[in-house]
Structure formats: C-alpha cells, structure tokens
Amino acid sequence: MNGLGRRVFLTAAGAVGVRAVTGTAAAATRTALDAVSGAGYVDVQLLNITDLHGYLSAAPARDSVITGAGGQRYTVGGVAYMATHLRRLRAGRANSFFFAPGDLFSGWEFPAFALSDEPTIEALNLMGLDFATAGNHEFDRTPGFLVRHMEQGLPYEGEGRTNTLPDSRGRRFHGADFRYYSANAVAGPGGAGVLPPYHVEWVNAPGGRQLPLGFIHLTALGTERFSNSFQPGLTTLDEVSAANRCAAELKARGVNAIVLSMHDGAVAGSAFDSGSDPSGPAYDLALRVSADIDAIVTGHWHCAFTMMLPDPSGRLRPFVEAGCHGQIVNEITLRLDPVTGAVVRELTTSTNHPNTHDVEPDPEMREVVDYWQGYATRYAGATIGRQRASFRRALSPAGESTMGNLVADWALWASAQPADSFDTSPRPEGGAADLALIALAPRTGRSLINTDLLLGSATEDPVTFERAWRAVGYGSPLVTASVTGRQLHDALEQQWATDAQGRLTYAPLAVSANVRYSFDASGPAGDRVAPADVLIGGSALRLDGTYRVVTSSYTLTGQDGYPALGGFRDPARHRRDTDSFVAYVAALGTLRAVPTGRVSAKGGALAAGRPGRLVPLGEPVPSVPAPVAAAEAAAGSTGGRPVC
C-alpha cells in the first residue's frame, strides 16, 4: 500500500472551526511552522506544475525553449532540475503546498509510457507532490487503474513484468504518496463520483491554530469521449455547476479560502510570465464560477500564462497555467486573515518560474531518471516473438496492405481477450467482435499503424518489445461496439470522397481475415459497395442486421473521417493499442505472412475503372506514438487548441 497514512479522511458532519471537516476532507500534508507575515497575515505558498506527461529526463524538443514577456528565451525541462528549483522555492516557506491540475502520467516518453507510468510516480513521490487533480490522461487506462494501481499500488496482470516493477532503490512499486481528486468525473449518468471531489489542507496560524484551505478539482469536460481516455463507464459533469456546488459546501463548513485546480485550459498570449487576450473554456469558467473561489489553476491546453481576472463580484483572483512537460513551476502566494482564514485578495501574487538548466540538477532525482532510462533500454530490447515475413504499410491499388491486414487481425483477436482486472466499465454480452476495421490512410488524423515491420536478411528475425510497441498504436484503446448493417455499409462507402479539386480520393479501411468484399471501381462515390458483395464470416451483409465491430476509439468517434460509425451503441473498451499489439505478438510467438485479397475490384476491373486516388500514407513515426505529438505541434504552431 502507499503512504497515504499522513492523510486522514473524515466523515463527521459539522462546520470547520478547528482541524476537522466533513466529506472528503484531508489532514494536513505538511508540518507547518511558518508563517505570519510582518503585516500579521498568514502566508501560504501554492506551487503547481501541470501536464508533465511522464517527461522525466527532458521536455521534447518542440517544448524545450519558452519565451518570456521581454523576449528572453529559456531552455527548460527535466525533473532533476525541477527538484532543485522546488527546493529553492520552498526554502523557509513551511505553509507550502505542491500540487498539479492533471495529466502527470500517460505521456509519450518511452520509459514512463511503456513501464505502466511507475517511473513518473516515483519521481513525483520524491518531489513531495501533495495532491493532484485527475486530468483526461489519468483515465487513459481505466478509473480502476488510477485508484487501485497508481494510488494504492495494487498489482495487476503481468505483475513483475509489465507492472509492479522495482524502483530505483529496489523497492516494489507501492503507488503514489498523494491522492487524486475530481468533482465532476462520475460513474456514468447519475452515478457516484469516481474520486473525492475536493479536500481541505491546513495552514498554521498564530497561537497554534490551524486555518482550513479548500481545494476543488475538475476534470476536462468530455474526457470519456476523448480518443485516449475513451471510457464507456465514465461521465464528466458541467464544470461550473460542479465547482459552484463544492464551493458552497466548503463555505457552509467554515472554509473561507478556496482554490480551484482544474484540468481544462486557455490561451493567454505567447509569453509564459504574463497573460493577455485570454480565451478558452477555462477563461469562460473563470469569469462565471463562484466568487468564493480565490484562485484558479488550470492545465490541459499546454499553454503558459499568469494573470489576474475579476470574479463575478469584480474582485481580482489569479488565473494561471504552467505550460507542460516540466517547463514551469507556478507559484501563487496567498495571505490569509489570521482570524477568519479568508484570503486578502489585494495581497495575492502569482509567478511562473521557468524550470531552467542554470542550476545543479538534484542528484537523487538524477539517479531516479537514469535508473528508469536504463531499465527501459533493457526492457525495450527484450525479444517477445519472431517474424518470418515482412509487413508493409504500402497500399495496393485495391487499398490493401500486409501491415494493415496484420493489424486488423490483431484487432479482432483483441476483441476476444478478457478485460483487465481494474476495468469496471459496462461490457455488453456477445463476446468477440464480428469483424475489425482499421483506418490505413484516413483523410483526417492518421492511422494507428506507425511503421513497417520488415524482415532482415535472415529467414527469421526476433521481434523486440520496442519494435512491436512503436509499430502500432498511440495509446488509445480498441473499442468493440454495435452498428447496423446500414452503418457498416455506409462506412465502407465513405472510403471514397471527392476532394476540393474535384478528384476522387480513396481512404481505405483494412478488414479482418473473416471479411471479403469487392467494390465497383467505375461507380460514383457513395455507390460503390453492394451489400451482397460484402461477406462477413461467409454471409452477405444485411443492412437491417446488427454487427459488433472493433476498431480504434479514434476511428469509432469519427475523428478519422468515417462518420457513419458515429451512431454506435453498447461500446466495450479493450486494452490500449500499444500494450495490446505487444501482447498479440507475444501470443502468436511467430508472425507469418498474411495474404492479401480481402478487398478487390468487382469483376477484376480495377485498371479500367476509377479506383480513386489513394490518400497518402502519413510519414512513419518511429519514435513517438501518433497522432498526438504531431497534432500538438501543429496546433501550437498555429495558435490553436492543443490535442492533449
């Protein structure tokens, strides 16, 4: 079990007059001796980071330099440097709380991503993180995984191989020494919260008294529908309503200082140390949410700003975001009235501190990072299977590829595997999917197939963990859902469309080995596939029938350009694509040639007809799961909302 013994959760009703609170209140996380300022106010330091995404060694190149208001540029990133900066900022500030508004793990640096995010938790424990808000990526596996493995340290399938690994000191993974919260993530419509909605920390005041400081937590609206965190058993509620409800409860219990930590964001200019022209959902919320909230700390958009905004009563309060990937530590200083515990707003300050490299990296944290880098290197090189054929993404004129067929067969296999032990989401009866569909060259987004799997000069090659892990997926789950025969037919028709130049384009879908279909290469877009020419398990497609189809959550939710699938019903989530494809290779033992011929032009008239201009394949992505990194970079360069 983890080290949550320092935190006591109370359930007795009543007001907060001394160190007690109802509901999900917490005991103080630090022993505080500070901190009455010279003016008689009680100083409180709030330190926060956001959207670390497991980038322990350094920020990715695109995020490694940030620019301040005067045009000065800073090289930033890396938790070893952050640990040093945190130690400096905390010095002499005993009433100090270190927290994060989400997306600390489930990122894209290989050691964290591939090793069940356990390296990230060890680093955060060492830095003394006090608590965190659940972001969308904290739900990339399941709510049960977040609570039972990441918080409580309980092992799951593959213990000792894929999880519950020895840390840098040789200790078995024990989970986080901090707790996660969310006020608006609930178990389905009308369900109970999956995490506590808020909590109370305690601030030392004169005369041995302690003042309550409440923290409300919000998860990004729509998390359950995002590609990576697609969760059929989760619902996110309106953010303003949830925050206002919690603020009212805290005030009713005598908490007069309240902070909102929310995993939704905004953009407010390009300088990390100021703010201008704000926009975005967090900004809209900041103007409307309860005036009882004294500070708003945001995340999710991978932006950086610090500014003051008026609450609904016109009083200013800080509105901040601390970038991403370890770029920045935000510091808010609150001064509390020593009698009432209320925040003296006029004295509040906020600063975004760059996580620069002009300090000595913390040696203990450097050891942690180096340990996990070495562990990941050894892990990556482990042989999980062998291959006796090459698998290429290159498309035939009919829109097939050997890599596409391999991946479609994996998806069908994955649909028949049991859910992991922490997954409590609804699972409709019916077993495996009837067929698999995989987008090979979608018009929007990009395929989950990242690279080829090529055979070397030998007749049989080993397949390492890293080769399989990098070949397929970007951390989204496969999902099986019910669609009608009409929807399935329409999705096949949507492979063809006319582009802005009037050219017919073809964005093919790979199908699993139990499917055969032909199309009319001379027909118009929208009328190329006859139901009688689509065979699933040897039987013709019935437009009035119901089929269970497995595909990526990215495709199922319409982000690949096949909107006919969007009316799906009864979804069942499977494991993350990267993890599942590795398991498939290991289960097969040997990858053998996968024949083509699942898709053909009707009557063999491909050359004589107009099959359509194949949508170009995306560039191979050998080092970062796609499409997240590419989409983030594109959004950032255009000033748009990041994909995060």
For the regions a language model picked out, list residue spans one by one.
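Catalytic centers of hydrolytic enzymes
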Residues: 39-87, 91, 125-126, 224-240, ...
